[in-house]
């Protein structure tokens, strides 16, 4: 099966807003996480080659539920987690979906890995490092993806990658992938890395 065809059939299943509404799948899941406005929705549309799959907003913090997408009629599930960081929602709402996200990550037995998106324009923020530390503490596998690389020079990317190598990380999956949803750069490599969960 060709890489692009793996992700070409993408069906939105449910937006879970509570623990009870989380769907029960036995197939592999890959979750996309990242700071608010890091480009998760754009990336989902890029890897599925459909601009309509995930709603894109210019306002950060709009995803307030866990969105589940069935890939290729049940080959796997792509999961869009709420963005952490800035949000216009009230504190109670933010705490609610953060708790839901933590519950999902800690209890999902069919979760293959978390794809953690980092905005290459700004690099690592403290909140990104806090999330990485949280994943490490709870021994959750994750892979880093640098987004919006069309807006930065290659030497900036080199610095970010160098920073990662200086961290003491035990549950990171390499390689670090550089992507641009706008230019479609790195998309095929990312699809390949996501598809590895199918082979396990």
From Swiss-Prot:
Molecular function (Gene Ontology), one example: GTP binding
Q: Which residues form the EngB-type G domain?
A: 26-200
Q: Which Gene3D superfamilies match?
A: P-loop containing nucleotide triphosphate hydrolases (3.40.50.300)
**Residues annotated to bind GTP:** 34-41, 61-65, 80-83, 147-150, 179-181
GO BP terms: namely:
division septum assembly
Cofactor dependence is on: Mg(2+)
Which positions does UniProt annotate for Mg(2+) binding? Answer: 41, 63
Q: Which NCBIfam families does the record match to this protein?
A: GTPase_YsxC (TIGR03598)
What family is reported? Belongs to the TRAFAC class TrmE-Era-EngA-EngB-Septin-like GTPase superfamily. EngB GTPase family.
Q: What is this protein for, i.e. what is its function?
A: Necessary for normal cell division and for the maintenance of normal septation.
The protein, known as: Probable GTP-binding protein EngB
């Amino acid at each position: 099966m060709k890489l692009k065809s793996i992700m070409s059939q993408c069906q939105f299943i449910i937006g879970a807003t509570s623990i009870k509404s989380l769907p029960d799948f036995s197939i592999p899941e890959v979750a996309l996480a990242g700071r608010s406005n890091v480009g998760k929705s754009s990336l989902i549309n890029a890897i599925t080659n459909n601009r309509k799959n995930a709603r894109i907003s210019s306002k950060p913090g709009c995803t307030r539920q866990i969105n589940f997408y069935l890939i290729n009629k049940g080959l796997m599930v792509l999961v869009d987690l709420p963005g952490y960081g800035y949000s216009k929602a009230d504190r109670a709402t933010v705490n609610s979906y953060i708790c839901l996200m933590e519950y999902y990550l800690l209890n999902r037995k069919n979760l293959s890995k978390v794809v953690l998106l980092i905005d290459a324009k700004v690099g690592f923020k403290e909140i990104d490092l806090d999330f990485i530390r949280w994943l490490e503490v709870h021994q959750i596998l994750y892979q880093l993806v640098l987004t919006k690389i069309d807006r930065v020079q290659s030497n900036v990317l080199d610095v970010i990658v160098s920073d990662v190598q200086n961290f003491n990380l035990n549950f990171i999956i390499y390689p670090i992938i550089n992507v641009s949803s706008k230019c479609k750069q790195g998309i095929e490599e990312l699809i390949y890395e996501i598809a590895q969960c199918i082979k396990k």
